[in-house]
Amino acid sequence: MPHDRATGLEDERPLMAKQMRKTLFAAAVVTLGITAANAAELPLLPMPASVTVAAGTFSFSNARIEASDIGTKAAAQRLQELLGRSGGPRLSLARGGRIRFHRDPSITGNEAYRVTVTPAGVDVAASGDAGLYYGAETLWQLMAAAGPNKRIAALSIDDRPAFAWRGIMLDSARHFQPVAYVKQLIDRMAIAKLNTFHWHLTDDQGWRIQIDRYPRLTSVGAWRQEAGAAGFDPKTGKPVRYGGYYTKAQIRDVVAYAGTRHVTVVPEIDVPGHATAIMAADPELASIPNPPKSPSHDWGILPNLLNPSEATFTFLGNVLDEVIALFPGPYIHVGGDEAVKDQWKANPAIQARIKALGLKDEDALQGWFTAQIGDYLAKRGRRMVGWDEILGGRVAEDAVVMSWHGIDGAITAAKSGRDAVLAPSPIMYLDHMQSDSADEPGGRAEIIGWRDFYNFDPTPAVLTADERRHLLGLQGNLWTEHIPTTDDADRMLWPRAAIVAELAWSNPKKDWPSFSTRLAADIRRSEQLRLGYNSTPLDPEAIFTGSDVITATLRQPAVVGTLRYTTDGSVPSPQSPAYLAPLTLKPGTTLSVRAFEGTQPLGTTKRWPISAALARTRTASEMELCGNAIPLRIVDDGPTAGKRLVHWVDVMHPCWIWHGAPLSGAHRIVAQVGQLPFNFSIGDDVEKITFPPPATPAGELQVRRDGCDGKLIATIPLASATKTTGVADVSGAIEPPDGAHDLCMTFTQKGIDPYWVLDRLTLQ
């Protein structure tokens, strides 16, 4: 192969030109417009705006890459990097390479790009650096699915995003994540063409950003004691400090890293509410005489508000000056949500200020408070972003409203000519559960399945075309109250963040069967890159009933692929029978089940040795909660070392119902129970939580049949379960009737902290 004399690089141009002439003639004859069926077969996520399929394939196993300037080389290096990480071939740079990255000024929009694949080569074109980068990632997706022959189909892709703001929010205040994880998340966002990283850095539970002028914000505000057993050293009994913060050097590193991946970092400094960490660091900024001395370990809406004094605005100005210096992007998020006004109402000086300002009430005062910050940022060339509560006051025309109370805030903002981002609860809140499996991590218990998530419509019909232009985009928010580890964060984020990308980039017409196939391909790419995601919704779930003969009813929460099973102990394969209806099985059989998308295995294989005991055991997750006031999956506070269980409970009413429990022949109950600290700030609602008085100091588990007001058939003392952190087994005799009956499980106890939870129940 000839070499370029100037560079010494191999020159593929003569060969490529000859092949290209042949290819262009063939393509002109057989090029076809893509159909819906063709699009469904492409392993791309998000789906490009336009695709045209041509005849033939391109072999890239020995191809080289041509790139001429900084932007094209960065895109080429991204392709090389992703291929290397996913087990693909090593493609070197060469003048005249058959994979060519180049500028095309006719492609409008910095993020737009075109990818053309012919049997002779690949052409990736864009006018902007981001477009070149995204073109490289789309090409990698095609290559990652190519298989051992390393061939991709001839086609042409013209692509651009539907929305400018395609975001993910990470809450680093409730639980601190290391810099390496933050960068990994940003890298994964870039792979999905997500371009806005909203970094929630301050809250009641911690302050996470170094501010030179106020060192106590991190020396005091970054650290707390965890609730319950987790807050103490098991060897010494002394309190354990928990938390952390990001130094300025680390933040600059993260911001620079994000810039190389075309991701804008939007920091959030949440005020005037969610301010306990600030008040602990500087009590003079509080609205009460004796503010907390440390950040809180409680979850919920705390009443602590900053005092709207001149000292507070001096503090905020100094903080924002340092924040602006660290984050060069156009946006600064100032929170503004969930500001309970009780402390302002009770403070005479604050009431006097309301009158002096000529304001109506405390809500108007918050509007004035937020407007001062917005004006401060505007004078420094930044746009304020705030949660939709900021609409209650004077909102600058260039402010961005982040709509979390459903989509109403975005609609109001757009109709008033202001920009908005859709981040509605619950659908875009990534701390909601993805299935009701007992294997799910902690989080809010209202289930937002993948299909429900995908069906969200980011273009409200009530808006005109002109008003819709004010919808900058959408964002998924990961609040981390119940997500203490980065492994759990990955499971809550992925693959749902990829669905956010699909909605924000493609804004597609809904076609779940097609999308689920592409989602399976995206999951496969995560596995190739060795990146974590939540496989639990892909796993089969089973309910067993019967005694002499067992009926197994199967389902898969994700509704992706096909469940296939074996009953001879072998591992399921793509050729195993598909599950179509409940299975009738004999005790002694081993049922093995796994999902497949075509030949691709999904999730994990579940195995159940069939016995009557399966029908006599239920986890709490398989039961119904008696109430739905604050349903959560809560991570146990113990053991202090090792894996902790996650409990399914309504903290306002700890009570579980097992429908149709098979009581015939049962004489004893074995229950797995645990204790959790009550660390929830729920205001006066705490008075609504009541328990029956206990007969013994530790309390009892009470089991009733045929409803929670039905006959008491078991009372099991809990004293033995208090001797360990984590969970413990307790047991007791029951007085069962024959047949199937609903069982209701509740606890007796003296107070609400700690409170008992049920993990599973077995009838013997």
Predicted feature residues:
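Short, compositionally stereotyped local motifs that mark structural "simplifiers"
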Residues: 513-638, 677-685
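Gram-negative bacterial Sec-dependent N-terminal signal peptides
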Residues: 20-36
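Contiguous, structured surface segment used for ligand recognition
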Residues: 40-165, 488, 504-529
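Flexible, acidic glycine-rich loops studded with aromatic residues
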Residues: 384-399, 405-550
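Extracytoplasmic
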Residues: 607-764
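Active-site neighborhood of glycoside hydrolase catalytic domains
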Residues: 296, 302-397, 404-411
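Surface-exposed loop/turn motifs at beta-strand-loop junctions within extracellular Ig-like
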Residues: 128, 595-599, 747-751
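Feature activates predominantly on carbohydrate-active enzymes
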Residues: 107-317, 322-331, 372, 376, ...
